[in-house]
A protein has these predicted regions:
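Extracytoplasmic
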Residues: 10-14, 51-53, 83-85, 92, ...
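Short, low-complexity Ser/Thr-rich regulatory SLiMs
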Residues: 3-7, 99-101, 138, 341-345
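Active-site-adjacent loops and short helices of periplasmic peptidoglycan-processing enzymes
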Residues: 1-85, 90-92, 97-98, 142-155, ...
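Short, Gly/Ser/Thr-enriched beta-strand-loop segments that form substrate-interacting elements
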Residues: 118-139, 162, 199-205, 314-345
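A small/polar active-site loop signature that marks catalytic segments
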Residues: 125-298
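Small-residue-rich helix-loop
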Residues: 226-391
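A conserved catalytic-loop motif detector
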Residues: 57-116, 121, 275-320
């Protein structure tokens, strides 16, 4: 906090939340952790603060206008897989629009969290029959949302989930709302208190990095991937902007002696269509990661096993490779890719398969990929099984 706490417990200053790019802050993917909001409010009370003259405000190194890479499609940024990365990521950077259609008009009556700065251009219509098809549009790094499409007339409010343009605003709103519900008013006045004399109330740590990476890889979470890349750039170069994350990844790959000719790394997740890489490049990265003394024992264990885990739980299911090959999946329109290791437990091969511009159905492609992989590794797996069953 900034300022001072008087004898009555009034803070003549602000509560300042400084972000560390942690993608897991109050994330639904780590449900067993105490929420940051609860921890913050509890610690504010422990410091004897009973009222706040100032505000709840964020301190951010990544500003909202740099949250989403410039070449991501606008159509992606309102989807959960297109959430930008911020210094303060909160609630998976998602929020809900609460829409009331009971009157015959589609009215946005609330947002959760409360986002006072959001601008909404509401063009939705209400129909008594037909498909429920709301459309949410927003340009990159912009807080103006356009709503269109048809909504069914219903007596109960309808919830539409989309990405937060500025998650720190939502977090500060939730902290303020929780404080006030606990009897600690926040006046929101401008106070003259220097940040240089601020006192630390709480240090809230993320889960350990392997847990974050495992969640990322199992679910193929773009926002988590972007956060890890930004943090890597900050750790090596002291700057969390996307360019330094890209530079940090390039530095590590070059230290492994991998040729980066014809390779373009633009973002941390692969959602950008500017990215260019070859199967040989990815296989070389996987091989180096498995042999590196710092990552070799850990990284292969973080990948989901085909037929068992995560986004590849239905791939190779019921085959001899189920549970025996670990792959990270990646996909977008016209693209389906897999990269990982075989065998899953003690990698001997790095495995990469990239498909682009296919014209068959996904199920047809999946069947072809499974036949290819089983044909490649079946004889090797039979040999392993025989060795394990030999007295």
């Amino acid at each position: 906090y900034t300022g001072t706490i008087d004898k009555n417990g009034t803070l003549n200053g602000d509560i300042v939340i400084e972000g560390g790019i942690d993608p897991t802050l109050d994330s639904k993917h780590f449900p067993d952790r105490e929420t940051f909001v609860s921890a913050a409010v509890e610690n504010i009370k422990l410091w004897g603060i009973k009222a706040i003259k100032g505000n709840i405000r964020p301190e951010e190194k990544i500003q909202p206008h740099n949250a989403v890479p410039k070449d991501w499609l606008d159509a992606d940024v309102t989807e959960d897989y297109g959430a930008g990365v911020h210094s303060i990521n909160y609630n998976d950077n998602l929020f809900s629009l609460i829409i009331d259609t009971s009157s015959g008009r589609a009215l946005v009556v609330d947002t959760v969290p409360h986002l006072r700065s959001i601008q909404i251009d509401n063009r939705m219509t209400v129909v008594n029959r037909g498909r429920f098809s709301p459309v949410v549009q927003r340009k990159k790094n912009n807080s103006r949302i356009t709503l269109s499409g048809a909504m069914r007339r219903m007596q109960e409010p309808i919830e539409v989930v989309t990405t937060m343009p500025h998650p720190a605003v939502g977090l500060c709103a939730d902290v303020r709302e929780t404080l006030e519900s606990e009897g600690i008013p926040v006046e929101g006045k401008k106070v003259s208190a220097s940040d240089s004399d601020a006192m630390q109330i709480l240090s809230y740590e993320s889960p350990v990095l392997p847990e974050i990476l495992k969640s990322l890889l199992f679910r193929s979470d773009n926002m988590y991937a972007e956060s890890v890349q930004r943090k890597l750039g900050e750790s090596i170069y002291g700057d969390p902007q996307r360019e330094y994350g890209e530079k940090a990844v390039t530095k590590i790959v070059e230290q492994w002696g991998i040729n980066m000719d014809n390779v373009t790394l633009y973002d941390g997740s692969g959602l950008s269509r500017t990215n260019r890489m070859t199967p040989l490049f990815l296989a070389s990265v996987l091989r180096s990661a498995a042999l590196d003394w710092q990552t070799g024992d850990l990284f292969p264990t973080l990948l989901p096993r085909c037929g068992v885990d995560g986004t590849v739980r239905n791939l190779l299911k019921g085959t001899c490779l189920s549970g025996n090959i670990a792959l990270k999946s990646g996909s977008m329109t016209g693209v389906r890719c897999y990269a990982g290791y075989s065998p899953a437990e003690r990698p001997r091969y790095s495995v990469v398969l990239l498909t682009n511009n296919f014209h068959c159905t996904y199920e047809q492609l999946k069947s072809s990929i499974e036949r290819l992989m089983v044909g490649m590794f079946e004889s090797y797996q039979d040999t392993i099984d025989k060795r394990q069953n030999t007295p």
